[in-house]
Amino acid sequence: MPEGNGTVALAFSGGLDTTVCVSLLKEEYGYDEVIGVTVDVGQPDYEFEEAEETAEALGVEQHVVDATEEFADLCMEAVKANADYQGYPLGTALARPVIAKAILSVAEDEGCSAVAHGCTGKGNDQLRFESVWRDSDLDVIAPVRELGLTREWENEYAAEKGLPVEGGDGGRYSIDTNLWSRSIEGSELEDPSTIPADDIYKWTDNPSDKDAELVEVEFEDGVPVAVDGEELGGVELIEQLNKQAGAHGIGRTDMMEDRMLGLKVRENYEHPAATVLLTAHEALEGLVLTQEERQFKAQVDQEWSQKAYQGLVDAPLTGALEAFIDDTNERVTGTVTVKLEGGHCRPVSRESDYAVYSESAASFNEEDVSGGITQQDATGVAKYHGFQSRLANKILDDAKKGAAVTDGSGDHAASEDTEE
């Protein structure tokens, strides 16, 4: 452990974990001053109010950093990569490196000797924060992990010290909210057999009798730039689609998530805008990319998603993957209309000047295909298609028949026929 006698910048939410960390960083680690850093990546206003009230009650200097634009930019990179992990669009994972960088910047500006977080030793966030911080010369402190703290111990400690812990973590669930997603975990949801109550959802209404709605999303170079003809910045565009699609109950995920440390956890997510944008983007790619590009890009997208899940968005491999993603997305320019209905989002129309599509070639009402190719020219292809499989199956059948003769089963059958 460091000797202290300096200043430490703490990732500060005002919840139980970080409130307890403020006290422990002074008592157990010997730091003279703790600076609380709260980073805005699209959380609701009440979270900032609670963090401010808690910081004031603790006598902690608080810094609030607006990183919504940076986070929205990273979300757009995720759209270009069709990014998801086991069916969830990486909202929490994408936010952590953005938050970590903002905290590190404040720590360096304020002359801190260390940075700290309140993550447990069981989750992913400790790794995502520290992958950014350990690239600096500052000490990294993780009190909850290093001291083996439990929620029960933290509550008892907070009561003993008279720490203000009414806000933040006071509810039944652990909730994390940003522009791209809202996650809900803990309490009875830790039992995979428990059916979640409807009241855990805040962004998405129950998909019921609401009339279907068509939404048009316009892309330039793979990045969504307008909704229903209205040009919007990244933050505003995501916020609008969260409301618009959330009203139709779109973007709910209930999953068993495999964390980086090997633990399985039950997670519930809400991500209306992410669902719409990823669906629309993939539909447009299907129109403008060749078959080979789509097949290979699916592998690249999956690898990018893995690096993003790990919080390694600045890794050299991630940059190399993005070079391919950016190159293919230069043609992902056009408009996709999606239908929002009953909790589902599906593309119903797509247009682009870069469409790798010929209506006349694909039409059942036209004789010729294109470039002098006719339907009859497919006969040779049809004869060869599956030839290797047919040949392999024939050789296998012949080998089985030969084996039957060798082991005597074939001769026995023949003698029986003769006797009859």
Curated annotation (Swiss-Prot):
Provide a GO biological process annotation.
Answer: argininosuccinate metabolic process
Q: Where is this region: Disordered?
A: 401-420
Entry keywords, A to Z: Amino-acid biosynthesis, Arginine biosynthesis, ATP-binding, Cytoplasm, Ligase, Nucleotide-binding
Give the UniProt entry's GO cellular component terms: cytoplasm
**SUPFAM superfamilies membership:** Adenine nucleotide alpha hydrolases-like, Argininosuccinate synthetase, C-terminal domain
Instruction: Write down the PROSITE patterns for this protein, in alphabetical order.
Output: ARGININOSUCCIN_SYN_1, ARGININOSUCCIN_SYN_2
Residues that coordinate or bind L-citrulline: 88, 124, 128, 174, 183, 257, 269
Give the reaction(s) catalysed: L-citrulline + L-aspartate + ATP = 2-(N(omega)-L-arginino)succinate + AMP + diphosphate + H(+)
Asked if the record carries the keyword Chloroplast, the reply is no
Q: Where is the composition biased (Basic and acidic residues)?
A: 409-420
EC numbers for this chain = 6.3.4.5
| Cellular location(s) | Cytoplasm
Q: In what pathway does it function?
A: Amino-acid biosynthesis; L-arginine biosynthesis; L-arginine from L-ornithine and carbamoyl phosphate: step 2/3
Give yes or no: UniProt keyword NADP. Answer: no
Q: State the top-level EC class.
A: ligase
Q: Name one GO molecular function term.
A: ATP binding
Provide the binding site for ATP.
Answer: 11-19, 118
The UniProt family comment states: Belongs to the argininosuccinate synthase family. Type 1 subfamily.
Q: What HAMAP family would the database entry show?
A: Arg_succ_synth_type1
Q: Which NCBIfam families match?
A: argG, PRK00509.1, PRK13820.1
| Quaternary structure and partners | Homotetramer.
Q: Under what name is this protein listed?
A: Argininosuccinate synthase
Q: Which gene encodes it?
A: argG
